[in-house]
Curated annotation (Swiss-Prot):
Similarity-based family: Belongs to the binding-protein-dependent transport system permease family. OppBC subfamily.
Originating organism: Mycoplasma pneumoniae (strain ATCC 29342 / M129 / Subtype 1) (Mycoplasmoides pneumoniae)
Protein name as it appears in the record: Oligopeptide transport system permease protein OppC
Residue intervals of the ABC transmembrane type-1 domain: 169-362
Record's keyword annotation contains Transmembrane: yes
Amino acid sequence: MDKHQKFDQSLFQRVDINVLKRSDQLIGKPTTNFVEIMKRLFQNKWAILFFLLIVLIILLAIIVPLASPYSAVTPVSNNALAQNLPPRYLWNGAGDIQVEKITARSIAEVAQSSGVLVGKLPEASSNPLATNVKYNIAPYQLAELKNYYPLLGTNGLGVDIWTLLWASMAKSLWIAIVVALVSMVFGTIYGAIAGSFVGRAADNIMSRIIEIIDLVPSILWIIVLGATFRFGGVKQFDDSVVIFTLIFVFWTWPAATTRIYILKNKDTEYIQAARTLGAKQIRIIFVHMLPVVTGRLAVVFVSLIPAVIGYEASLVFLGLKPATEVGLGALLNQVTSSGNIALITSSIVSFAILTVSTRVFANALNDAIDPRVIRR
C-alpha cells in the first residue's frame, strides 16, 4: 500500500474505549455455577410458581397446627351433633346453617333436647332406638359451637378438618424429609465410593447390591422389612419402622445417580491434576468429585419427597399403618369411607398440589442444571 495513500475518514467512527462493554475489561468476582443455575431456574415462571406453592405448603404445615385452637386428634365437642359439620364463616349466624341428618331416633331426640332441631321430629316407629329418621338441625346453635368457625367443617369424628389437614401434611413432610436426607447422605457416599473404584472388585460388589435391591418391588421390601423389624409385637408399623424401611428402599436412587456422574467425571483434567499432585483418593472423592454432582443430587432430593409421601400413604391402605394416626395416608383413607365433600376435596387437592409442585420444580431444576438443555 502506498504510504502516501489516505484513508477516507467518513468510513470510520470514533469511539471511546472506556465505554466499550467488553467482558475482558470487566473487573470483579466471577459468578459461581450455583448463581448461574439459580438465575436459569428462576427465569422459568412455572418454577417460580410451584416453588412458592411448596413454600406455602410448608409454612401452613408448620403454622396451622401450632396456631389452631383445635386439636388434630380430639373432637371439637363430645356431642354427636358436632360430627360432619359444614364450614362456617364470620358472616354466618348460628342459625344460618342447617344440616340434614339421617340417624337413629335417639340422636334426633338429643338434637331436640339441645334446642337445635329445625321443625318437628318425625314420628317414632315400633322400635324407635333402632330406626333411622331424617331431620334438620342448626348445629351452631349448640352452646359449645356458637363461637366455632371451622374453615372446612369437621370430619366424622368431630375433628376440625383444617387443623387435621395441615397436621397430617406436617407429619408426612417430616417423615419424607428425614427419609430423603438420610437416603441422600448414605446413598451419595456409597455411590461416590463405588464410582471412584470402577472396574475393581469393590465397585462390582457394591453395584450388584444396588441391582439386587432395585430388582425386588419396593412395596415388597417394605412389607418384609416392616414385618421383620416391628417393635413390641404390634401388627402395624410405627413411624420408626416406616422410616427405616423407606430409607432402605430409596437410598439406592442417589447412590446410582452419584455413581453414574462420578464415572463421567473421574478422568477429567482437574481430577488427573489432583492425582498427579498426590491427592489422596478420599480427598479426590469428597473435595473434587462430589461437588460436580451436587446439582443432580438436588434434583434427586426434591423428587424423593413426593415419592416417599406416596409410599407412606399407601401403607395405610394396605393395613400396615394405623388409619387412626395423623398423616396424609390416614387422611386419604378417611376419604374413601366419607361423604364429607370438604374432607374429600381438601385432602385430594392438597396432596395433588404437593405432588405436582415438587415434580415440576424438580424438572425445572434439572433443566437449569443440564448443560444439554442450556445449549438449546
